[in-house]
Amino acid sequence: MKPSIILYKTLPDDLLHRLEAHFTVTQVPNLHPETVAQHAQAFASAQGLLGASETVNRALLEKMPALRAASTISVGYDNVEVDALTARKIVLMHTPAVLTETVADTVMALMLATARRVVDVAERVKAGEWTESIGPAWFGVDVHHKTLGIVGMGRIGMALAQRAHFGFTMPVLYHARRRHQEAEDRFNARYCDLDTLLQEADFVCVILPLTAETRHLFGATQFARMKSSAIFINAGRGPVVDENALIAALQNGEIYAAGLDVFEQEPLSVDSPLLNMSNVVAVPHIGSATHETRYNMMACAVDNLIDALQGKIEKNCVNPQAAG
């Protein structure tokens, strides 16, 4: 008899068939309490859980006593109570490698769009404001040869440094929990403390996961240390930044502009002051959102769950100690 799993994300037919070759699959729209209650027997017997963007917490795990592995279609897992999974010897699988290049492309796009005011001037053209040769009121600032400061030198940080160093001749500074010798050797990146990075960088790019240590890592003090000409990019997690402090820094001219893929509350409220600022490029958490990469993420998550329920957790496992 095949193990049973809960699938809470719509998959392409070929990936669904791959799952069904290994498991009895119950598809549900979400993990809300009413959904769990409606499918109580399926949740109670499920050994696997696969999906994205829903909260996986202790209350859910209480309804899933047979659960052995959870697979998230994402690299981040701040919506999952990992400690609760580990305590129950449930492994958590994620998809870190397949989205690296695409997210780095998004960060680079935010840097370019924000610096060159692409969104703002495009909207002005559409509004009929381009009636004569443009002047300084339409100008942006250069990206090439500017100093890039990367906060978080993981896979995505490395991919961004590669683009900046080789493609735009940008000196690279970085701050991370530990020095990254490969970044220093390949991109001549310079490790520095956060204050130094903030004071010297023309672009400050945040690519950090959300943890207790990184929550509101960027607040009024940090923005005050940045150049008034600096551009701030957040492509990590929204709550890493105190959004009210960011809004104040933009309104007061403490920093030049911001490109934001993530926010403290998502979706972003329609009455957020950020939406009325011409020096803000705001996009809806599109970091990995290409057709190709999202398919590859789903395929990776499917394979991760198949492997995990066969005891193979050598790669892409967040908490391998849970299998001990």
UniProtKB/Swiss-Prot annotation:
The keyword Protease does not apply. It is found in: Cytoplasm. Keywords: Cytoplasm, NAD, NADP, Oxidoreductase. Coiled coil: none annotated. Its main location: cytoplasm. The active site is at R237, E266, H285. Homodimer. This is Glyoxylate/hydroxypyruvate reductase B. The lineage of its organism: Bacteria, Pseudomonadati, Pseudomonadota, Gammaproteobacteria, Enterobacterales. The gene is ghrB.
